[in-house]
Amino acid sequence: MSHALMQWLHAPVATVALALLLSTPLRAHAAVEDPFFTALDRYSADDFGGCARLLGELLQRGSRFPDGGELLLVECTAAAGDRSQAMDYVNQLLPSGRLSFDDLLHKDLPGLNALRADPAWPDMRRRVEAAERQRLAQLDAPLRRELLERAARDQAAQHVAIDAGGGDAFKGVAPVAQANADWLKTVIADKGWPTYSMVGRDGAKAAWLIVQHADHDPAFQAEILPLVEEAARAGEADLPDLALLTDRVLLAQGKPQRYGSQFTTAGDGTMALRPTEDMDGLDVRRQAMGLQPLAQYKATLSEAYRKPVR
C-alpha cells in the first residue's frame, strides 16, 4: 500500500469502517468492479488524472460517494493539475457538508497542498470558513462535542488493545464501551438518533461507532439498527455504517452476516470471515452499500490489525 494512500485514511485504525478509505491493488481478484475503488486504485498508482475522471463522472451521475469520497475528488483533480476545476468542485460541494473542513485546510496531500498554494486560495478559504461557521451554527454543538470526545476515548482504548496484540487486551475496552452506550441511550431517548443535521457527519459517525462497539448489549444494537437504516435512507447516515451494524446484529442473533464485514481471530492467530450468507452474491451486496470488494477488505484488515486474514 503506498504511503500516499495510507495518508488518505482519516478514520481511526480500530474502526472496521476504515476499509472504506483504504484500498490495495487487488482489482484482478475482485468479483465486482466498483468505480470509486477503481479511482482509489488510480490514486494509489499516482494516476491522478484517471482518478479525477472517474470520480468526476460519478459526481455528474449523482452517485453517492463513500465517506471522504468528495475530498478525494478535489484531491485527485488538484493533483492532476486542474486547480480551477478542483475549486469549482469545492464550491459545488460545500453546501452538502460532505467536505471535511479540517482536511480541506490542513491535510498534507499533494493535490490539496497545490490547491492551498494557488493564488485564488485565500478567497476560497474565506468561503470555506464562512460555510463551516454557518454549518456549525445549525448543529447541537454540546452534543456533537460530547460524541466526539467519547468516540476518541473509545478509539484510544482500541489502539491500546491492538498494540498489545488484541485478544484479552480488548477486555480493557469494555468499561469505555459500556459507559458510552449507557450515555447514548439517554441521548436517543431524549433527542432521537444523532443525524448529520443534528450533530454533523463527524458527530453522527461517533454515535454509530459507540453503537457498533456495544457488543456487550446486542439488544441495544438491534434496537438502534432501524434508526440507522432510516437515517441512511434519508441521507442522514452512511450506507456502509448501516451495513456494518447490520452484520453485527445478525451475528449476535445467531444468523449469518449479510455484508461480510465481521471477522474473528482463529486459533492460529489469523483472522477469518465469520459465517456469511450467499457468498456468490457478496461483492454485489457490498458494492450496493458502498463497501469495497471482499479481497480488498481482507487486505485492509490485515494491514490494520497486523495479522494474516483469510
Residue spans for each PLM region:
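Bacterial N-terminal signal peptides
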Residues: 12-25
